Amino acid sequence: ARELPLVSLETYRPLHEFDVVGVSLQYELCYSNVLLNLDLGGVPLRSEARGDDDPIVLAGGPTCTHPEPLAPFVDAFLVGEAEEVLPDLLRTIGRMRREGRPRREVLAAMSQVPGVWIPSFYERGLDERTGMMVVTGRSAAGVEANAPERVTRIFVRDLDEFPFPSRFPLPYVEAVFDRASVEITRGCTEGCRFCQAGMIYRPVRERSPEKVVEAVLDGVDTAGFDSTSLTALSTADVSCIDPLIKTLVP
């Protein structure tokens, strides 16, 4: 009612003043919320309407394996697991923004990072066999930027190199799952054909038991929770689950 823009949690900075707006696409039903947040934050909805002073809208998460439904609204998708490439990617964006480089140059530099898909660098066409709109190749801008013809999903090879975060914002209200959570493995040994996560998070990788115990104790100590969930697609299939539980529950 007061036409106040959407602001950040920590600094109360309006969304449209950031260099990058990052969104995590966990489910397709979240797509409308992404557009609502951009609108409330004063960010032009369509990427083609954004100028050099507008933030880069960067999306990641599981549903980025099929990015096209949000392609008109997102400047760049990071397909796969972001831990290894995201810090350098953000530093590159920040440096180029400070130098006053045009938006197209920033996107061109981003397209050289493994796993980054820039929708505006590709063309679409109607597939006569399926009746669906599909990517047909690079656009003229994509060729000029030397964008890859195909973007490959990236993944972290060693989870222990990226400790699970234990310091995170606490909600003002009681959460549905009121406990700490630690990812102990990524990927799944079952390979069920109906399971998207089991396919896109291949190969199976496990954190070492020592790192898991360290993350559990750190999370409980910093967040004040008295219980922790060991998160995995199939926790019982983790190779070290028996000794891990015996260590955590004496």
Each language-model region and where it sits:
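Ferredoxin-type iron-sulfur electron-transfer modules and their immediate structural context
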Residues: P119-E123, D127-G131, V135-S181
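Glycine-rich beta-alpha loop elements in corrinoid/cobalamin-binding modules
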Residues: R2-G142
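Short amphipathic alpha-helical segments, especially helix-boundary/capping motifs
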Residues: L9-P14, P62-H66, A145, F168-P169, ...
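Intrinsically disordered, low-complexity boundary segments flanking structured domains
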Residues: R101-A108, P148-E149, K246-V249
